[in-house]
Swiss-Prot record:
UniProt xrefs under SUPFAM superfamilies: Glutathione synthetase ATP-binding domain-like, PreATP-grasp domain
Cofactor list: Mg(2+); Mn(2+)
Domain of life: Bacteria
Transmembrane intervals: none
Family: Belongs to the prokaryotic GSH synthase family.
Protein name per UniProt: Glutathione synthetase
Lineage: Bacteria, Pseudomonadati, Pseudomonadota, Gammaproteobacteria, Pseudomonadales
Organism: Pseudomonas putida (strain ATCC 47054 / DSM 6125 / CFBP 8728 / NCIMB 11950 / KT2440)
GO molecular function annotations of the record: ATP binding; glutathione synthase activity; metal ion binding
Length: 317
């Protein structure tokens, strides 16, 4: 019997054909003969105590001019699907949380949800990394300016960032003697009402912020180094960085081995680790990317490896 795979994502018509990781996953699933069903966040709902969706059958194509075709909308229980990929991009807001509640109902009805809804709620992408202090640069989370100032005085060169940012937004570098620290803290903490993260600056960022993809707790053999544009301290592609695929180093594999068992335990089947130099900086659990860039550089099939892992999970049930 064919696997019925649903996906919750941002509008498929607006994705970047060349870079979109969700499309890579869908192409891999379709190549296995699986049936695809498309949903956007607003299509999820609950009726008569059951999680449901207005979903549409989906076909995908390796064609930059026409990469998808949608069928007629149908109203169905999520329990009729075998697996659901939650690929809605941040922001991680209350609407995202409500979506995880609905997906958790589907999970309780026997659907495999990738990634596990509870873990999507629990694992803030910046805070999650602090569970592995042996892997991270000196890090502080606080909303009190005096505590943050003590940290910046100790480390002299630091990165300050919100806990809920994405794509490199609102990330500041502060160095000793910079007169702008007060306004940076006022802005990021919203006058002391919001927790933020401070990390000791890593000079290795000039060589790239590496995205290491993890499938069921095991690393893909290659990563994508996102190298900052001239004059930048952020490697994010959304902030103008350029991507360069590379093999993993021994240190990368060590970090992956430290984190992998926890990912498996939490049902986080597809995850992106962010590593600068020798240090883990973030663990991305909501809609990680960079599949297409690594596949293009090394002729890998990361989407296929993910579908293999999903297939194993389904058969083990």
């Amino acid at each position: 019997m064919s696997v019925r795979l649903g996906i919750v994502m941002d509008p498929i018509a607006s994705i970047s054909y060349k870079k979109d990781s969700s499309l890579a996953m869908l192409l891999a699933a379709q190549a296995r003969g699986w049936s695809l069903f498309y949903m956007e966040q607003q299509d999820l709902y609950q009726g008569e105590g059951k999680a449901r969706a207005r979903m549409r059958p989906l076909k995908v194509f390796a064609d930059p001019a026409r990469w998808f075709e949608l069928g007629e909308e149908q109203d169905s229980p999520l329990a009729e699907l075998d697996v659901i990929l939650m690929r809605k991009d941040p922001p991680f807001d209350m609407e995202f949380v409500y979506s995880t509640y609905l997906l958790e109902q589907a999970e309780n009805d026997g659907v495999l949800v990738v990634n596990r809804p509870q873990s999507l709620r629990d694992c803030n992408e910046k805070m999650f990394a602090t569970l592995f202090p042996q892997c991270t640069t000196p890090t502080l989370v606080s909303r009190r300016p005096d505590i943050i100032r003590e940290f910046t005085a100790k480390h002299a060169d630091v990165i300050l960032k919100p806990l809920d940012g994405m794509g490199g937004t609102s990330i500041f570098r502060h160095r000793a003697g910079d007169p702008n620290l007060s306004v940076i803290l006022e802005t990021l903490t919203a006058l002391g009402t919001q927790q933020i993260m401070a990390q000791a600056y890593l000079p290795a960022i000039k060589d790239g912020d590496k995205r290491i993809l993890m499938i069921d707790g095991e690393p893909v053999d290659y990563c994508l180094a996102r190298i900052p544009a001239s004059g930048e301290t952020r490697g994010n592609l959304a902030a103008g960085g350029r991507g360069e695929a590379r093999p993993l180093t021994e240190r990368d594999r060590w970090i992956a081995a430290q984190v992998g068992p926890t990912l498996r335990e939490k049902g986080l089947l597809f995850v992106g680790l962010d590593v600068i130099g020798d240090y883990l900086t973030e663990i991305n659990v909501t809609s990680p990317t960079c599949i297409r860039e690594i596949d293009a550089a090394y002729n890998t099939d990361i989407g296929g490896k993910l579908m293999d892992a999903i297939d194993r999970k389904l058969k083990a049930r």
